[in-house]
Amino acid sequence: MPVRRGHVAPQNTFLDTIIRKFEGQSRKFIIANARVENCAVIYCNDGFCELCGYSRAEVMQRPCTCDFLHGPRTQRRAAAQIAQALLGAEERKVEIAFYRKDGSCFLCLVDVVPVKNEDGAVIMFILNFEVVMEKDMVGSPTHDTNHRGPPTSWLAPGRAKTFRLKLPALLALTTRESSARPGGVGSAGAPGAVVVDVDLSPAVPSRESLALDEVTAMDNHVAGLGPMEEQRALVGSSSPPAGAPEPLPSPRAHSLNPDASGSSCSLARTRSRESCASVRRASSADDIEAMRAGLPPPPRHASTGAMHPLRGGLLNSTSDSDLVRYRTISKIPQITLNFVDLKGDPFLASPTSDREIIAPKIKERTHNVTEKVTQVLSLGADVLPEYKLQAPRIHRWTILHYSPFKAVWDWLILLLVIYTAVFTPYSAAFLLKETEEGPPAPDCGYACQPLAVVDFIVDIMFIVDILINFRTTYVNANEEVVSHPGRIAVHYFKGWFLIDMVAAIPFDLLIFGSGSEELIGLLKTARLLRLVRVARKLDRYSEYGAAVLFLLMCTFALIAHWLACIWYAIGNMEQPHMDSRIGWLHNLGDQIGKPYNSSGLGGPSIKDKYVTALYFTFSSLTSVGFGNVSPNTNSEKIFSICVMLIGSLMYASIFGNVSAIIQRLYSGTARYHTQMLRVREFIRFHQIPNPLRQRLEEYFQHAWSYTNGIDMNAVLKGFPECLQADICLHLNRSLLQHCKPFRGATKGCLRALAMKFKTTHAPPGDTLVHAGDLLTALYFISRGSIEILRGDVVVAILGKNDIFGEPLNLYARPGKSNGDVRALTYCDLHKIHRDDLLEVLDMYPEFSDHFWSSLEITFNLRDTNMIPGSPGSAELEGGFNRQRKRKLSFRRRTDRDPEQPGEVSALGPGRAGAGPSGRGRPGGPWGESPSSGPSSPESSEDEGPGRSSSPLRLVPFSSPRPPGEPPGGEPLTEDGEKSSDTCNPLSGAFSGVSNIFSFWGDSRGHQYQELPRCPAPTPSLLNIPLSSPCRRPRGDVEGRLDALQRQLNRLETRLSADMATVLQLLQRQMTLIPPAYSAVTTPGPGPTSTSSLLPVSPIPTLTLDSLSQVSQFMAFEELPPGAPELPQDGPPRRLSLPGQLGALTSQPLHRHGSDPGS
């Protein structure tokens, strides 16, 4: 049985470390990936979601510049500083005004902190948000959302925009205002100032992007500051103006990331003035505050510019070399990001000179920024977050509890404890008495006794073991390795410290020379307390049969040894005080010819005494006593009774359970070794390579240690279904109680869902979903963290309570994964398969709408680049539909079917089958709207709900309609599409045929009957190109037409036979019904109506006129060869819609009991 190694495996604890440190600080932060386009957000905590009002699903994959929080009062200069901070490796603090989802404005201090990986490269950014104050929305009549409505509606015209700013914000704003004036404090010549191209255009909020080459400076009217004289008085006397700046060249668009097609960057060049006086005077807001207070500049954690290393030296620099170096660096153009979507524009390559300047800027990301992270985020000196697999952090002079040294030391202490358990009772009973009776020993001190020296060494080793235990790591309840010395000491004090301390006291040294040898012998027996730790140490071998038997035999022998020492002590204590020689020692001396003399001396040797005593205890414990050594005195008899009682218990507990122990031990180990043998045989047979073989073996060992080889499903199957549901409800209670989509569900629905959930345990590094895998399940994370990668780029980090998969209600068939899902730590996930979830929701339709509306998938794994008409997609969908056959449809009887089936557009069915959200959309003829992100379900280019893979225009099978009326009798929208709620365009054409088949009980007619599943309302429709070419080959179309022809021939044959049967039944009833009839009715009471043929009553409703639709439908086989095929891809269609026969017969058909719609 392998030792559990779960707590020592390397884990990526980056996210857990950040969350654990921020729990008690009420932090609000997001984590962005620096290697993807726009530095997309890959994680946001609950505090940030509460701050901005957005959910985690809405924030994921957005640019970390938080442009979705921008509004009319958001300073473009502050947004430019955040964007510039994303280029470098230095931490930066920016004060900016943001807007919540409900439209309320707040002033926020943003900390942009880079995070490096094991190679030292910055791959992530942590943005911490701290609310400075809530801004007063002066003149704002209503709180609109920050992404809707024109910006001019926020403030009344003619009123000043005033902010109540704190002093740090005012100073920072003054610095930004001063930097816009030539030669002012903090001008562009300062190396620490943020230099961007500015103009005086008003700040207009952008919906998707922030163009930093159009950043404007805030004027006095927007900032709400006093006159310029008050600002100068606040800062102090500034340096004289240095003249007007040089004209700025027109900015050119460049790209810093050739791989990211979704974004581009622009470079803005600014020539700074060579004004050293302004640089020495002040270069940042911190220096201004220091000048104002008359104190030296405070120590700073952050840099407000890109030239932070030069700042401290330039304030006091007097040499020409320093000034020349500053002038050279100040000529480097500043770099700003431009998050503008330029997907349609070609890639613009930057000149060679610009590349040489950009390269050092990008290389700054490889600086060591870990200390900055800990200082800014207050993580503590012992926590350095790095996104990598981290081994447990161990303090200096700390010993790992699983290290080889600790293992060897434990075995050494174990041997010393066994020595103590054997020799301490023997020394106390035999040797001390022998020393008293023997001749006087020479005066050579303590070293003349060999056992005393060994005892002294044992005492020293026990004391050293106590010191080592104070520096040995342990595993806490969370399976974390604790290496902090203080926590280790507290844990040891609460555990084994008292027992170890008592066992390590050197009583021989403390009472040496006092003459009380008997007292020393009794006190030394306290070392036997260490046997408790030995039992715990040997408990890990309790599943090995041979080890258990050996330990039991050793325990039996040790108890016999202790009892032998006590048996000798009793006889030796009574021997000098007995007048009659009846003790067992006197009998032993007489038997071996070594009797005791009158003075009590002489007698058998120590060897004879010990062997005889051990012989007696063994024979008494095993109840085999021969009687040659027998108790004679009362004390000996009482002790013998006690030995017999102990022997009976020992004999019953040990030897009586030997067979049971062997069976139990070999049952567990046999299962483990059998399964391991199968795994190794599988590896050998298939020639698995070594890396994959190691992963297989490690996963098997970890899974065995986690479940102990118990199949939970097999255990549950042994209980009744009601008890299984209760157990599953208990196992999934945390998910069902705290996950929002499951709130409001009935007890029966929760029990049904709990039965379908499966728990998955994944170790670090295990890949749960590979790119391109079929998404057949929905995953809910209950513990641990995972990462989602596209190639080698991390696109998302998900933690507890996150959901990933695909929105099952939007697609009729499962899609493919667009990335790899890999575990960072030990994870527990709940997953439910697609078919199981849809089956439960069909059984509870009243809960289905609430579930789909409240379900927020944190990351959508569906690949949006799939081509709907690609080869093999039809076979995939057909196989999926055949696999998922739901024969029962739990639909409310109050739900009415649409009156007419509708018509499929010739340009594609996406216009009519997009659901209610696709009607009345003013965005264009297709109702399109810009997508919010690459992972949103609206931006999918795959087939949507209700969409078929090939365009089709179906010839109607009903009576002609007026010219201006569309098929189905429903009005058209502005762009000509029909506003129909139905999702089945062919249901009307085949409704008559399906009702006939359901009446005659054709089981094959119910095989593919499913309710049309309409999608939930979505913000935007899928964009379908007008010229969508048919991707199916001509042979496939002809094959499908031939199959339809054969099916119709079979149906025609069956219909003819059924009609003949109907006619025969009608002829038999000619004498029982009136001559003039149009339908068979139940005859009235009379002498001739002896019986009523109930099964025949609905038959005459199927007249030949009502079957004319079948003949029209069979004429479909004569369509020209180039006619388009019938749609095979799309949502499952319900073929039996009784509302479609209204135009064919005045009397409604009687619905058969097996019809799903009944």
UniProtKB/Swiss-Prot annotation:
Residues 910-926 have a biased composition (Gly residues). The keyword Cell membrane applies. The keyword Transmembrane applies. Highly expressed in left and right atria of the heart, in cortex and hippocampus; detected at intermediate levels in left and right ventricle, Purkinje fibers, cerebellum, thalamus and basal ganglia; detected at low levels in liver, spleen and kidney. GO terms for biological process: cellular response to xenobiotic stimulus; membrane depolarization during action potential; membrane repolarization during cardiac muscle cell action potential; negative regulation of potassium ion export across plasma membrane; positive regulation of DNA-templated transcription; positive regulation of potassium ion transmembrane transport; potassium ion export across plasma membrane; potassium ion homeostasis. It is found in: Cell membrane. It is a multi-pass membrane protein. Residues 882-891 have a biased composition (Basic residues). Keywords: Cell membrane, Coiled coil, Glycoprotein, Ion channel, Ion transport, Membrane, Methylation, Phosphoprotein, Potassium, Potassium channel, Potassium transport, Transmembrane, Transmembrane helix, Transport, Voltage-gated channel. Residues 1034-1061 form a coiled coil. Residues 927-938 have a biased composition (Low complexity). Residues 959-969 have a biased composition (Pro residues). Pfam families: cNMP_binding, Ion_trans, PAS_9. It catalyses: K(+)(in) = K(+)(out). SMART domains: cNMP, PAC. Phosphorylated on serine and threonine residues. Phosphorylation by PKA inhibits ion conduction. Residues 741-841 are annotated as: cNMP-binding domain. The chain crosses the membrane at residues 403-423, 450-470, 495-515, 520-540, 547-567, 638-658. Residues 232-314, 869-987, 1116-1158 are annotated as: Disordered. Belongs to the potassium channel family. H (Eag) (TC 1.A.1.20) subfamily. Kv11.1/KCNH2 sub-subfamily. The S4-S5 linker acts as a signal integrator where it both couples voltage-sensor domain (VSD) movement to pore opening and closure, as well as providing a binding site for other domains that regulate activation and/or deactivation of the channel. PANTHER family: POTASSIUM VOLTAGE-GATED CHANNEL SUBFAMILY H MEMBER 2, VOLTAGE AND LIGAND GATED POTASSIUM CHANNEL. The potassium channel is probably composed of a homo- or heterotetrameric complex of pore-forming alpha subunits that can associate with modulating beta subunits. Interacts with DNAJB12 and DNAJB14; chaperones DNAJB12 and DNAJB14 promote tetramerization. Heteromultimer with KCNH6/ERG2 and KCNH7/ERG3. Interacts with ALG10B. Forms a stable complex with KCNE1 or KCNE2, and that this heteromultimerization regulates Inward rectifier potassium channel activity. Interacts with CANX. The core-glycosylated, but not the fully glycosylated form interacts with RNF207. This is Voltage-gated inwardly rectifying potassium channel KCNH2. The lineage of its organism: Eukaryota, Metazoa, Chordata, Craniata, Vertebrata. The gene is KCNH2.
